[in-house]
Amino acid sequence: MSSVKRSPKQEIVTQFHCSAAEGDIAKLTGILSHSPSLLNETSENGWTALMYAARNGHPEIVQFLLEKGCDRSIVNKSRQTALDIAVFWGYKHIANLLATAKGGKKPWFLTNEVEECENYFSKTLLDRKSEKRNNADWLLAKESHPATVFILFSDLNPLVTLGGNKESFQQPEVRLCQLNYKDIKDYLAQPEEITLIFLGVELEMKDKLLNYAGEVPREEEDGLVAWFALGIDPIAAEEFKQRHENCYFLHPPMPALLQLKEKEAGVVAQARSVLAWHSRYKFCPTCGNGTKIEEGGYKRVCLKEDCPSLNGVHNTSYPRVDPVVIMQVIHPDGTRCLLGRQKRFPPGMFTCLAGFIEPGETIEDAVRREVEEESGVKVGHVQYVSCQPWPMPSSLMIGCLAVAVSTEIKVDKNEIEDARWFTREQVLDVLTKGKQQAFFVPPSRAIAHQLIKHWIRINPNL
């Protein structure tokens, strides 16, 4: 049988792949210097030079190709990446090189354009006006201003009421109870029993200020409607509810907080996170003595005169935010995604993997570490998408897309209960039909849902 005649390009691709398979670094370098476009060229079976080097145990070739920026996420016709091949043939050193390499070419199915979006808990009614936090006289005047808005909390649960048309078949809208000075002045008279936080001023000037023109001297009116969060103890909260039968404290936090109007949810996220910090830091982390609240609720100051925390700026004196990575892990071929579940989840719910960023760690490295720890899957390229404040009690969810460079799942049962690859079609069915399917994902107001939808929207014709 006569052999099929190859084109000049096919011939040079074959030579390039053979040099990788044979470990001939000199020949490989020479070919690539004349034809750099060959770096990610595939053979008829979908293999790249990187795959041939991984299959035949040539770490120096693998290292060279990685330094040139080859794409580790390419899959062959057997749905294997170069890392999968190295692991299968037992080349641990090469597998480690492929798993830990950074940079490289962005996978073809990811776009360069990432539209900025506002997730739930991100929108707000307020300008925080941080420059007013040190102005004690201004804050005191605003506390008693008739237009000032107070939102009440007990055990970090906001006081709400049902809005909208109660005769409608739709679920009633949950809204914050916006209280005024007269409603809560008795609590303000007992500062040692409450926690008061200045949240900011309304972004839009309100006509309601005109209603109080006679109550506030004109020279003292600055046109700003201030908002405060007020934390009270459970006994006081119960007494307040008895006097206001149409109000109740919204709990448990999840999923109850997802019922709020979007802009009010942003206010609650701010207030709840700061109140949670105060509930945990009543005593100085440096020396153990008591502390007092300053700067409108955004600082705690130690009462001990010689405490080191009084010298300089210390992060223990200010509200903390815990950064968390949450990632939509994409299969190397771009057609599937990795979702997992914890034991505490409702039956059938799967979501994006997530975990806290550790000290001295980048977002990208945290994504790679968490995915591998929980699922055993190795990740290469990481791309930021959007973020979401998450007041449980004070996290910032940093949403990313992460492209896998291996496909075998090995779940750590101490981390999660299960993890699986789901096809684009399966995920689309879940997004359009909801819980009618065999599994479901978090609601639309969770960033995990938005990351999943973001993946579906890119390259929809795959």
Swiss-Prot record:
SMART domains: ANK. A motif (Nudix box) lies at residues 355-376. Disulfide bonds: none annotated. Binds 3 Mg(2+) ions per subunit. The modification N6-succinyllysine is found at residues 185, 292. Residues 319-453 form the Nudix hydrolase domain. Mg(2+) 1 binds at residues 354, 374, 415. It is an enzyme of class 3 (hydrolase). A motif (Microbody targeting signal) lies at residues 460-462. The keyword Metal-binding applies. Mg(2+) 3 binds at residues 370, 374, 415. Zn(2+) binds at residues 284, 287, 302, 307. Its cofactor is Mg(2+); Zn(2+). Keywords: ANK repeat, Cytoplasm, Hydrolase, Magnesium, Metal-binding, NAD, NADP, Peroxisome, Repeat, Zinc. Its main location: cytoplasm. ANK repeats lie at residues 11-40, 45-74, 78-98. It holds the Pfam family Zn_ribbon_NUD. Mg(2+) 2 binds at residue 370. It comes from the Eukaryota. It is found in: Cytoplasm; Peroxisome; Cytoplasmic granule. GO terms for cellular component: cytosol; peroxisome. Homodimer. Homodimerization is essential for its catalytic activity and protein stability. Interacts (via ANK repeats) with BLMH. Belongs to the Nudix hydrolase family. NudC subfamily. mRNA decapping enzyme that specifically removes the nicotinamide adenine dinucleotide (NAD) cap from a subset of mRNAs by hydrolyzing the diphosphate linkage to produce nicotinamide mononucleotide (NMN) and 5' monophosphate mRNA. The NAD-cap is present at the 5'-end of some RNAs; in contrast to the canonical N7 methylguanosine (m7G) cap, the NAD cap promotes mRNA decay. Preferentially acts on NAD-capped transcripts in response to nutrient stress. Also acts on free nicotinamide adenine dinucleotide molecules: hydrolyzes NAD(H) into NMN(H) and AMP, and NADPH into NMNH and 2',5'-ADP. This is NAD-capped RNA hydrolase NUDT12. It comes from Macaca fascicularis. The gene is NUDT12.
